[in-house]
């Protein structure tokens, strides 16, 4: 089975505007997952998402806020962190937050933010197509102690999803040395 599973908080419910209250409810919900997760032996890797999707998908956007959330749960044997370059590349405090995360780093997802993206969910670029310095982010992850796999996560409805899968894999392999 899986060693860990990526989880998100979810966004604000319809009609809700109190971000702080929703974060507190999310924290309460994750507290209820501690014992079932511990019993299963599967760690939960909490993933902050880009602030552009905060309303509907996640009420936590910065790695520092995710770490505060994990600190409040106080169960590093159960919870860790998933870092998605697409979601956190813009955070000027990211390097310090990754150092703070240290052994709680469980997953690392990479893609690229296109300069003129048309859809924040389904218009991701392949590493090297946009503005994210994935190589630097990987170095920060490794400096913080991360030794896991780098997962290329391309949600690209109008581009990469329409290509031959073998070509997509070849592109990833061709670009890994330069951009990852």
Where are the predicted features?
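Active-site acidic/histidine proton-transfer and metal-coordination neighborhood
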Residues: 1-80, 90-92
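Histidine-acidic metal/acid-base catalytic patches
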Residues: 2-3, 60-83, 87-180
């Amino acid at each position: 089975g899986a060693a860990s599973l990526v989880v998100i908080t979810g966004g604000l419910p319809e009609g809700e505007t109190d971000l702080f209250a929703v974060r507190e409810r999310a924290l309460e919900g994750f507290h209820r997952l501690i014992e079932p997760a511990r019993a299963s032996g599967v760690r939960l890797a909490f993933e902050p998402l880009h602030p552009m999707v905060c309303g509907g998908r996640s009420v936590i956007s910065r790695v520092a806020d995710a770490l505060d959330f994990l600190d409040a749960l106080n169960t590093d044997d159960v919870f860790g962190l998933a870092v998605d370059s697409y979601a956190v590349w813009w955070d000027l405090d990211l390097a310090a937050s990754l150092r703070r995360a240290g052994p709680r780093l469980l997953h690392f997802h990479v893609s690229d933010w296109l300069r003129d993206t048309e859809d924040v969910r389904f218009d991701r670029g392949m590493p090297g197509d946009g503005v994210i310095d994935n190589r630097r982010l990987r170095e920060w992850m490794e400096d913080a102690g991360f030794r896991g796999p780098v997962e290329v996560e391309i949600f690209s409805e109008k581009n990469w999803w329409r290509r031959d899968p073998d070509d997509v894999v070849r592109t990833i392999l061709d670009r890994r040395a330069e951009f990852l």
